[in-house]
Amino acid sequence: MSQQPYYETMYILRPDIPEEEVETHVTKYREMVTEAGAEVLDNQMRGKRRLAYPISNHKEGIYVQLSHNGNGQQVAVLEKAMRLSEDVIRYLTVKQEGPLPAPRIVPGSEPEPVEQQEAAAVEA
């Protein structure tokens, strides 16, 4: 019984772009994969990290990982958009075999419980 392959795309954004713009890029690439007929399995912000060597005079970068499955056509669309973007300094897509990755909960991405939201509204 063979499992359907999936793809993992890791890309590095320039470290000097604002947080709002980082979110815009993440959303744009997720939507691009979905529009190409693939399913987004997982999307992780790995944060700002030091690079092993300077890339385009940058010593740090904002790492983002995007896991998706589909027929492979979405990879060309995604990589072309990343190649043309000035904010993406490096990207790599790897075809994975085996079980699909389980969705991970990234700290800070969990919604607040309703009781905490109501308490914050009362205090304000």
Curated annotation (Swiss-Prot):
Q: Which domain of life is it from?
A: Bacteria
| One example GO MF annotation | structural constituent of ribosome
Question: Biological process (GO) annotations?
Answer: translation
Q: Where is this region: Disordered?
A: 99-124
Question: Which Gene Ontology cellular component terms are annotated?
Answer: cytoplasm; ribonucleoprotein complex; ribosome
UniProt-listed InterPro entries: Ribosomal_bS6, Ribosomal_bS6_CS, Ribosomal_bS6_sf, Ribosomal_S6_plastid/chlpt, Transl_elong_EF1B/ribsomal_bS6
Where is composition skewed (Low complexity) in this entry?
114-124
Q: Which UniProt keywords apply?
A: Ribonucleoprotein, Ribosomal protein, RNA-binding, rRNA-binding
Protein task: Binds together with bS18 to 16S ribosomal RNA.
Entry-linked NCBIfam families: S6
Instruction: Indicate the family of this protein.
Output: Belongs to the bacterial ribosomal protein bS6 family.
Name the UniProt record assigns to this protein: Small ribosomal subunit protein bS6
Per the UniProt record, the source organism is Prochlorococcus marinus (strain MIT 9303)
